[in-house]
């Protein structure tokens, strides 16, 4: 007996590559994917977004009694001053500070992220993270995002079991250890004052005055720096804010107004 299987045949349509569905997919606009063997080259060839010029002045240096950290408070986008009250010295923990230079959002986010990781390290290991460890942690994080448009130039300053520590970290993952740094568009002017007046055996008062004067002179010459000069001291007992002075008041302190003397010359007129 032969069974009739004609009723079991499928009547569903079979789409081939040439059908309209696949033709529509082929017409969909696409974009280039990065070459995994030359990712950095792909980033260089990509069209960059408009990035307004940024500017700031921050500095930090190690001396006999700890680390002195100072910064201005102006935020700018190109020639536009967007704020005069930005907090550019960020408290990571009670014994460690970070500075902001570059993109405000990038610096604030990654400092906040670093503070969380430092706290988790403290809870897991029952001891505070060292300045060396915190700076290395931030550098490793930023290195993973290199070439992705981050703008970060920060200093990590603090006090740990080994004493004072100071590191510079940038958005490419670079990390430098040093005794004094200045970062930002006003740093060339700040370096001039800092290098001229720096001594390791300064008192806290002398160090804070040097930091304040260096930031002020940078704001005097650099249009992207200004606002308020904030100075912090990091010592064995943690960080403490020393001063916060408006640069306008500091101008009259460093350059006091001296009344000009007007000399009147008497001229005898001889009549004809």
Curated annotation (Swiss-Prot):
A Gene Ontology molecular function term of the record: endopeptidase activity
Quaternary organization: The 26S proteasome consists of a 20S proteasome core and two 19S regulatory subunits. The 20S proteasome core is composed of 28 subunits that are arranged in four stacked rings, resulting in a barrel-shaped structure. The two end rings are each formed by seven alpha subunits, and the two central rings are each formed by seven beta subunits. The catalytic chamber with the active sites is on the inside of the barrel.
Places the protein is found: Cytoplasm; Nucleus
One Gene Ontology term from the biological process aspect of the record: proteasome-mediated ubiquitin-dependent protein catabolic process
Family recorded in the similarity comment: Belongs to the peptidase T1B family.
Keywords noted in UniProt: Cytoplasm, Hydrolase, Nucleus, Protease, Proteasome, Threonine protease, Zymogen
Catalytic activity: Cleavage of peptide bonds with very broad specificity
Protein name per Swiss-Prot or TrEMBL: Proteasome subunit beta type-5
Function of the molecule: The proteasome is a multicatalytic proteinase complex which is characterized by its ability to cleave peptides with Arg, Phe, Tyr, Leu, and Glu adjacent to the leaving group at neutral or slightly basic pH. The proteasome has an ATP-dependent proteolytic activity.
Signal peptide: none
PROSITE patterns: PROTEASOME_BETA_1 (PS00854), PROTEASOME_BETA_2 (PS51476)
Entry superkingdom: Eukaryota
GO CC terms of this entry: cytosol; nucleus; proteasome core complex, beta-subunit complex
InterPro entries: Ntn_hydrolases_N, Pept_T1A_subB, Proteasome_bsu_CS, Proteasome_sua/b, Proteasome_suB-type
Active site: 56 (nucleophile)
Residues making up the propeptide: 1-55
Disulfide bond residue pairs: none
EC number per UniProt: 3.4.25.1
């Amino acid at each position: 007996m032969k069974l009739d299987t004609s009723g079991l045949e499928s009547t569903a349509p079979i789409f081939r590559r040439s059908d309209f569905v696949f033709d529509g997919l082929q017409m969909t606009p696409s974009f280039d994917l990065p070459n995994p063997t030359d990712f950095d080259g792909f980033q260089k060839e990509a069209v960059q977004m408009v990035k307004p010029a940024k500017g700031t002045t921050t500095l930090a240096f190690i001396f006999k009694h700890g680390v002195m950290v100072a910064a201005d408070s102006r935020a700018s986008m190109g020639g536009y001053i967007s704020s005069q009250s930005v907090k550019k010295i960020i408290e990571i923990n009670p014994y460690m500070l970070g500075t902001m230079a570059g993109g405000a959002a990038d610096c604030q986010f990654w400092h906040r992220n670093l503070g969380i990781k430092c706290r988790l390290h403290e809870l897991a290991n029952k001891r505070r993270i060292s300045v060396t460890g915190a700076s290395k942690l931030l550098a490793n994080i930023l290195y993973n995002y290199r070439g992705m448009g981050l703008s970060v130039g920060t200093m990590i300053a603090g006090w740990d079991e080994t004493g004072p520590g100071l590191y510079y970290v940038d958005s490419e993952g670079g990390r430098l250890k040093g005794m004094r740094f200045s970062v930002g568009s006003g740093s060339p002017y700040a370096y001039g004052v800092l290098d001229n007046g720096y001594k390791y055996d300064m008192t806290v008062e002398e160090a804070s005055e040097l930091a304040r004067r260096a930031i002020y002179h940078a704001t005097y010459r650099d249009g992207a720096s200004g606002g308020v000069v904030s100075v912090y001291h990091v010592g064995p007992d943690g960080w403490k804010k020393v001063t916060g002075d408006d640069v306008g008041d500091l101008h009259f302190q460093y350059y006091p107004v001296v009344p000009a003397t007007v000399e009147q010359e008497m001229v005898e007129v001889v009549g004809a």
